[in-house]
Amino acid sequence: ALDNPIFGVGMNNFYNNYFYYSTHWDGLNHAVHSTWFGVLAESGFLGLSLFICLITTTFIAAWKLLKNTDLSKLSPGMRVAVNAAPAGIVGFVVSGTFLTQGFIWPVYLQIALVIALQR
């Protein structure tokens, strides 16, 4: 991130650049094993800032939805979805610390779910 602080090394290029930045080369490229460092390496500080804003905004929206919705008026399935939305974001944040999942579809489905629930 320090060599390419604004835009990073580019999307899906962490693996290809591992050799250049690794202090210990064992002949294999490795995964970053952190969503946060993966996004930082591939999209720079600008991309990481936007990603954190996206996740934070989604969590706030999900939390407000949970607190401001009269759950008794919802169908059982919708009630479960409204209750699960903030938990899903928290689960992503925690697991994202140990897994590289910033550019795979489940987190974006979670964001879409929160947007759909608001409507």
Predicted regions and their residues:
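Gly/Ser/Thr-rich beta-alpha loop segments that engage phosphate groups in nucleotides
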Residues: 10-14, 46-49, 93, 98
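Long extracytoplasmic/lumenal interhelical loops at the membrane interface
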Residues: 2-43, 64-73, 84
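Hydrophobic transmembrane alpha-helices and their immediate junctions
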Residues: 43-88, 113-114
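Alpha-helix N-cap/helix-start motif
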Residues: 29, 48-49, 102-106
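Transmembrane alpha-helices of multi-pass inner-membrane enzymes
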Residues: 87-119
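Short amphipathic alpha-helical segments
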Residues: 13, 31, 35, 57, ...
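Hydrophobic alpha-helix feature that most strongly marks membrane-spanning transmembrane helices
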Residues: 2, 6, 19, 54-67, ...
